């Protein structure tokens, strides 16, 4: 199969079986598929209990409804990674615009900023469209993207994309039950939502 036709979402949604168990065969394959230990770092982040997804919901919802809305609805949400040290800052992720506030992601653009070529010319060119069913792989087919998608990826973007752009089953596996390691929190108060943006985002 040609790399341009590879459906990452279809593969990553098989990370968790129907019985809510990690599929070790898929985990091993993904380890080989992604470069420079990216999968290992993203998977470690998924198991770190440092990932939070804050969801704005003016009307309170049950926990399962809240998770389903992240796949079946269009809620306003903020994926955030808790700082690891006292001097660290929270990492904010925006999957819709493929942006992360971490230094690793910023470093991918830095060489283009110091060069003579404008950033838009350095990173963009016409490309073929991606498979419309492959939410996770859409980065590779963004109109005009020149840079290698793997270079515009960090562990935070990868981990949240695994949770939010593959299958609801994967999100449930990591965010529900006694062993939950990713926290999905609904916010119903506009004051609390604004405080989140002032204090974290």
UniProtKB/Swiss-Prot annotation:
Protein localization: Nucleus
Primary location class: nucleus
Assigned keywords, A-Z: DNA damage, DNA recombination, DNA repair, Nucleus
Superkingdom per UniProt: Eukaryota
Physiological role: Plays a role in a RAD51/RAD54-dependent homologous recombination repair (HRR) pathway to repair MMS-induced lesions during S-phase. Required for error-free repair of spontaneous and induced DNA lesions to protect the genome from mutation.
Family (UniProt): Belongs to the SHU2 family.
One GO CC term, this protein: nucleus
Name of the featured protein: Suppressor of hydroxyurea sensitivity protein 2
GO biological process, one term: DNA repair
């Amino acid at each position: 199969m040609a790399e341009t036709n590879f459906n990452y979402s279809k593969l990553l949604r098989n990370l968790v079986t129907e019985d809510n168990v990690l599929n070790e065969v898929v985990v091993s394959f993904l380890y080989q598929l992604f470069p420079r230990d990216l999968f290992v770092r993203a998977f470690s982040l998924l198991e770190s209990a440092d990932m939070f997804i804050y969801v704005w919901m003016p009307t309170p919802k049950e926990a399962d409804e809240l998770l389903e809305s992240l796949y079946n609805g269009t809620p306003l949400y903020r994926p955030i990674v808790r700082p690891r040290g006292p001097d660290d800052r929270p990492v904010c992720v925006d999957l819709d615009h493929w942006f992360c506030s971490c230094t690793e992601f910023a470093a991918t653009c830095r060489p283009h900023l110091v060069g003579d070529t404008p950033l838009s010319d350095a990173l963009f060119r016409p490309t073929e469209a991606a498979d419309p069913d492959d939410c996770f792989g859409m980065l590779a087919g963004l109109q005009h993207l020149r840079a290698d998608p793997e270079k515009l990826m960090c562990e935070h973007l990868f981990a949240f994309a695994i949770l939010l752009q593959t299958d609801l089953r994967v999100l449930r596996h990591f965010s529900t039950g006694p062993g939950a390691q990713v926290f999905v929190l609904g916010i119903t108060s506009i004051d609390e939502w604004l405080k989140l943006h002032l204090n974290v985002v």
